[in-house]
C-alpha cells in the first residue's frame, strides 16, 4: 500500500471537523470526562458565526462536520446551521446521538447525519428516529453502531434492523479513549463477538481509494488494520482542519503537527504544506480519506 485518498473529488476543498463543545446529554462508559460533560458553557453564537465567516475566507469550498460532545444541545445550533447555509458552506454533516425528536432533525438544512447509536441508552427509540429520517426526508444518513462488549445482543439486533431497512451502517469497535489512543481494546470482547464484528463490512458507500484501485470505507480500513501511515506525507491541514471545543485549531482530529493557534481568538495560521505523520495508527475515520502517500525515499528502502 503506497497511497490513500478520498473516493470523492474533495482534494480541492477543505473539510472542517468542528467540535462545538464538551456538553453532552449522554455519559457513555467509554467516553472520558476530559472530552464530555454536562456543565461546560456553550460558546456564544456570535463567536461561532464569526468563525464561519473566517472559514469562508479559506479560498476553497468548505465542508463542515459538527461533532461534540453532542452538538445539538447547543441552544443556538439550528441558528448556526442556518447561518452556515446562508453564507455558502457547501456541505454540512452532523454527528449526533439521535436523542432529539424526528421533527428537529428533519427541520435542519443539513446534507448528512451520522447517528452514533449508543447501546447503553434507548437505542430502539433512536433507531425509529433514524428510520423516519430515511423514509421521510432526502437527508443522507449513516448509522454508527457502537459495539459495546457487554451489549452484543443489542448490537446484533440493531445491525439486523439496519440491514432490513437498508439503512447504511457501520459496526464500530469501542476505543476506550481513557487509555491507549492508538489501539482498540479487543481483549474486552468474547472471541466470537470480535470475529463477528470484523466480518461486518460497512454498508455505507466506500469513501477511500487505496493505490488507485481498492474502494473501501474508512471504518473498514481501521478494522482491517490498514491504518498504519507513520512517516507518510499527509494532506492534513490542506484538505482538513479540526476546531476543538475551545477554538484551538489542528490539522485533523489526530492533532498531528500540534496546534495551529486559536480561531476564536483570531490567532490561527492555515498550513501551506503537508505534514509527515508521526502516529503509529490513524484511528479516526474522519482522517482516513485525507490524501496521503509513502515518501519516495521510503519506497526505495
Label every model-predicted segment:
Residues 48-66, 74-161, 168:
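Radical SAM/AdoMet-radical enzyme domain recognition
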Residues 1-14, 246-301:
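Flexible mid-to-C-terminal extensions adjoining Fe-S/redox cofactors in radical SAM and related proteins
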Residues 30, 34-37, 168, 214, ...:
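Secreted/processed peptides and extracellular or luminal domains of membrane proteins
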Amino acid at each position: 500500500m503506497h497511497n490513500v485518498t478520498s473516493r470523492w473529488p474533495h482534494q480541492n476543498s477543505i473539510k472542517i471537523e468542528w467540535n462545538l463543545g464538551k456538553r453532552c446529554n449522554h455519559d457513555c462508559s467509554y467516553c472520558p470526562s476530559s472530552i464530555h460533560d454536562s456543565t461546560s458553557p456553550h460558546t456564544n453564537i456570535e463567536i461561532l458565526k464569526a468563525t464561519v465567516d473566517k472559514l469562508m475566507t479559506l479560498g476553497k469550498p468548505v465542508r463542515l462536520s459538527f461533532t461534540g460532545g453532542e452538538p445539538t444541545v447547543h441552544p443556538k445550533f439550528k441558528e448556526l446551521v442556518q447561518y452556515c447555509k446562508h453564507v455558502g458552506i457547501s456541505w454540512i454533516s452532523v454527528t449526533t446521538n439521535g436523542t432529539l425528536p424526528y421533527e428537529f432533525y428533519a427541520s435542519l438544512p443539513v446534507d448528512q447525519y451520522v447517528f452514533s447509536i449508543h447501546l447503553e441508552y434507548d437505542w430502539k427509540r433512536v433507531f425509529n428516529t433514524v428510520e423516519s429520517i430515511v423514509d421521510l426526508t432526502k437527508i443522507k444518513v449513516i448509522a454508527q453502531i457502537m459495539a459495546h462488549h457487554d451489549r452484543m445482543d443489542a448490537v446484533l439486533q440493531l445491525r439486523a434492523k439496519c440491514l432490513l431497512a437498508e439503512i447504511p451502517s457501520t459496526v464500530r469497535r469501542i476505543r476506550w479513549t481513557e487509555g491507549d489512543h492508538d489501539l482498540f481494546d479487543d481483549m474486552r470482547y468474547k472471541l466470537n463477538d470480535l470475529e463477528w464484528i470484523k466480518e461486518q463490512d460497512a454498508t455505507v458507500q466506500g469513501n477511500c481509494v487505496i493505490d488507485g484501485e481498492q474502494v473501501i470505507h474508512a471504518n473498514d480500513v481501521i478494522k482491517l488494520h490498514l491504518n498504519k501511515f507513520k512517516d507518510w506525507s499527509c494532506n492534513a491541514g490542506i484538505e482538513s482542519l479540526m476546531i476543538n471545543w475551545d477554538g484551538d485549531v489542528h490539522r485533523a482530529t489526530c492533532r498531528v503537527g500540534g496546534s495551529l493557534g486559536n480561531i476564536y481568538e483570531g490567532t490561527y495560521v492555515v498550513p501551506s504544506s503537508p505534514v509527515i505523520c508521526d502516529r503509529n495508527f490513524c484511528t479516526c475515520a474522519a482522517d482516513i480519506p485525507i490524501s496521503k502517500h509513502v515518501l519516495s525515499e521510503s519506497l526505495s528502502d
